[in-house]
Amino acid sequence: MKITDIRTSEFSVPLRTPFKTALRTVTAIHDVLVTVTTDDGRHGYGEAPPTAPITGETIGSIRCAVEEFIRPALLGREIEDLDGTMHALHTAILHNTSAKAAVDMAIYDLYAQERGVPLYRLLGGSKTELETDLTISVNSPEEMAADSLTAVGRGFRILKIKVGLRPELDLARIQAVRKAVGPKIAIRVDANQGWSPAQAVRIIRGMEDAGLALDLVEQPVKAADLDGMAYVRRNVSTPILAD
């Protein structure tokens, strides 16, 4: 089963309510769909989200990476030669991780199709259920408390709470959420690089002193500020997660 074509297209899905983080406000999902076609007429699909503030990729750069660099490197490749095909994919262009991920998904889709089994079985998955968290958009403390309560009502037991936009409100936000959902719900905080190291230590210590029992705090400072991350980790008790 040889790769005969790789194409990209764009699609948009409007959100019912804006999704806000310290990095951006999203009103619609604008993604790139990648379709890999083989000589027996099968199609594999992958999706690439453009997240310029995080990966540096845009819709234009993703489509260019796939069509101008990855496509020529993979045409004629055998899907069955998974290691060789993946090596060609990842050496076709430096970085461009979302573009590569979408093609990776499409290739694995085809690999599973040829064998007539679900992909999760090929990858060794055996669970029929997987517990995940639900992300709460950054808003006023009252709105975030209400959104968190709705999520718990839907059965979620782990919440990821976005903060970092107007940091002076962040302690009140988490206090409101904890009061709304009670002590048994796991709370993870994601600042999306929205704090300085000093702010992060002050705010996290405030949450610790208030007994808010956080699972972790994700990316409190700029992603490239490794010294800042280390400073925060040394000066708080809550686990710090790098994104």
What are these regions (language model features)?
Residues 1-188, 192-194, 198-201, 205-208, ...:
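N-terminal capping/lid subdomain adjacent to the active-site entrance of alpha/beta enzymes
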